[in-house]
């Protein structure tokens, strides 16, 4: 197995449907709204900075075109490792307004894709 790390901005096409959990956080509102899921804002535990996050499951169909906008990885803070994606087209239709969202690196590693020429 070879390590493949797409460059930021490279266009990728999903070769299989990809299902993943999305954290209800303001940076993910576009994909949450696109899928018709009600956004549930983050709650804080009273008197602390501890957060209670809500997640919802989302699926992008095979053929969806997306790119990577950001990698976030910090040593010693693995629970925050994430990749931000931008969806450019679904079902062969270019989106007028791109969907931008982030998922954990573990969720991103489950995506099957190929590079778009």
At which residue positions do the language-model features occur?
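SH3-family beta-barrel domains
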Residues: 1-51, 109, 114-117
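Hydrophobic beta-strand residues in large extracellular and virion-surface proteins
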Residues: 12-14, 66-68, 83-87
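Extracytoplasmic
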Residues: 9, 61-63, 96
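Conserved beta-strand/loop element in small beta-rich adapter and peptidoglycan-binding domains
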Residues: 49-72
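Intrinsically disordered, low-complexity, charged/polar segments
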Residues: 91-117
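Short aromatic-glycine-enriched beta-strand elements
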Residues: 73-88
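Residues that cap or initiate secondary-structure elements
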Residues: 18, 72, 91-93
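A short, structural micro-pattern
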Residues: 6, 60, 79-81
């Amino acid at each position: 197995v070879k390590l493949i790390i797409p460059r930021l901005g490279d266009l990728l096409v999903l070769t299989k449907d990809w299902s993943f959990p999305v954290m209800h956080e303001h940076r993910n509102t576009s994909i949450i709204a696109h899928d018709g899921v009600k956004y549930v804002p983050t709650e804080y535990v009273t008197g602390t900075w501890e957060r209670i996050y809500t997640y919802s499951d989302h699926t992008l169909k095979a053929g969806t075109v997306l790119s990577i906008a950001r990698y976030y990885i910090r040593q010693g803070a693995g629970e925050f490792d994430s990749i931000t994606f931008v969806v450019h087209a679904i079902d062969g239709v270019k989106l007028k307004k791109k969907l931008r969202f982030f998922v954990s690196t573990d969720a991103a590693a489950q995506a099957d894709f190929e590079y778009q020429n």
